[in-house]
Amino acid sequence: MKRYLLLRALTIAALWLTASTCLGQSGPEKGGHEIQVFAGGGHSVSGGRGSTSILNAGLRYGWVLTNPHLPGFLRGRFEYAVDALPVFAVFQPANTAYGLGFDPLGLKWNFERRGRFSPYLELTGGTLFTNHNVPTGTNPVNFMDQAAFGTHILGARYNWSLELRYMHISNAGLATPNPGINTVQVRLGIGKFYRGHSR
């Protein structure tokens, strides 16, 4: 029940924030930087241990590395990002594990903006350290592989982001068994793109 209330609250907050933003930021551009704080959560799906929910919050720093490339609707800019997740909770049947994560590999494709929307695709990888084994009976050290699709909603001073994220957590064979956890999450963030220097 808690996970459904969380998803409803995130959806309502996203709709309210979308209505309250106005056009202002130019969005990602070469040489620019992104700073963002975010929070998200979701529930397990098939392919690993079930009956598990995840909540997390963190900070992102990104570097927009390219000018626009590719034709048509694929046109966009490449961004490299790192995420720190000092808040990470895994609600599993045996216990609740608390920990922190670090994603040093964030590969993000920022599509050309459409009005005040700047959609993106992203692949992320990192590590997770928890006070209990995740999943139960395995290991407290895990690796996280993630894929996300979302959009920035550009405002006058800040941008909001709303995304759907798939996260796979496993110990990569550090312990046996290695069933892993697969979750689908909704993430909401607030941040800012800082312009690059003109050359």
Placement of each model-derived feature along the sequence:
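Gram-negative (and chloroplast) outer-membrane scaffold detector with strong preference
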Residues: 57-131
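Extracellular loop and loop/strand-boundary signature of outer-membrane beta-barrel proteins
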Residues: 45-47, 92-94, 131-137, 172-178
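Short loop/turn motifs that connect adjacent beta-strands in outer-membrane beta-barrel proteins
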Residues: 24-32, 66-78, 112-118, 154-160, ...
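Cleavable N-terminal export/targeting peptides
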Residues: 1-29, 195-199
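Residues that define the transmembrane beta-barrel architecture of outer-membrane proteins
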Residues: 31-33, 51-57, 96-103, 117, ...
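Transmembrane beta-strands of outer-membrane beta-barrel pores
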Residues: 39-45, 63, 84-90, 125-131, ...
